[in-house]
Amino acid sequence: MTAATIVLIPGLMNDGWVWTGQLGSLSRMGPVYVACNDGLTTLADMADRILETTQGPLIAVGHSMGGRVALEMIARAPDRVIALALVSTGAHGARETEAASRQTLVDLAITDGMTAVARAWMPGMMSASTPEETRRAIQAMIERADAKVFAGQQHALLNRPDRLRFVASLCLPTLIVTGDADTWASPTQHEELAHAISGSRLEIVEVAGHMLPAEAPDALTTLLHAFILENLQAQQSSEDANFASIGTE
């Protein structure tokens, strides 16, 4: 059996650190690939990079922008993605109000640096209950981001395709997770996603905002572990059945 690779796709300004709370548990389940979206300016190119640098079946787990990248992966290689987890994300196209606000942050990054971006961006992205230690770690991650990489990712998001009709056509196991305090990608937005994707399951984590993987790592890990285990077992059962049918021909 070719074991499915668990692909963890970070969001805007995020690197692999955002998945620190999940890596230990998930890496014991099978191969894990942490994607890097740096240097690319379209979601399509981000998806292509992942598909080109991995092999075989994939379980795609995307946070925020990473969820949109996961949808582009499915659009390009539907036979390779066997299960999907969407975390604090969406499928709609860019709204009219986004261009100005995103450009303001890009300009701030170029003129004042990523520390200034972190200070401007972070307050509305986390639950008020998020510990100070977690806040500092998230700020450090944002400060590590390159301003030009940040600008490229913002370009990708402003020019993203509207995938609302596409998600309604999905027919693969899908877990949708959000925080109850996410004001950027609201629980209502995720309820709409769950309604659109047939057979999907929605989980709302209490006392967590948009930076859910870091804010509520244990809760998210528990949800992902159960979902991924279920789909790895289904993959094994399917391959066993195929092998048995070949043996009787």
Regions inferred by a protein language model and the residue ranges of each:
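Conserved HGGG/HGGXW glycine-rich cap/lid loop of the alpha/beta-hydrolase fold
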Residues: 1-47
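Flexible "cap/lid" loop of the alpha/beta hydrolase fold
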Residues: 43, 75-76, 80-119, 125
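Conserved acidic catalytic loop of the alpha/beta-hydrolase fold
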Residues: 43-58
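Gly/Ala-rich beta-loop-alpha elbow adjacent to hydrolase catalytic centers
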Residues: 62-66, 70
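Conserved alpha/beta-hydrolase catalytic His-Asp/Glu region
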Residues: 94-97, 112-168
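Short beta-strand/loop motif that positions the catalytic acidic residue
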Residues: 170, 176-178, 182
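Short alpha-helix in the alpha/beta-hydrolase fold that links the catalytic acid
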Residues: 172, 186-195
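Catalytic active-site module of serine/aspartate enzymes centered on a nucleophile-bearing elbow/loop
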Residues: 200-249
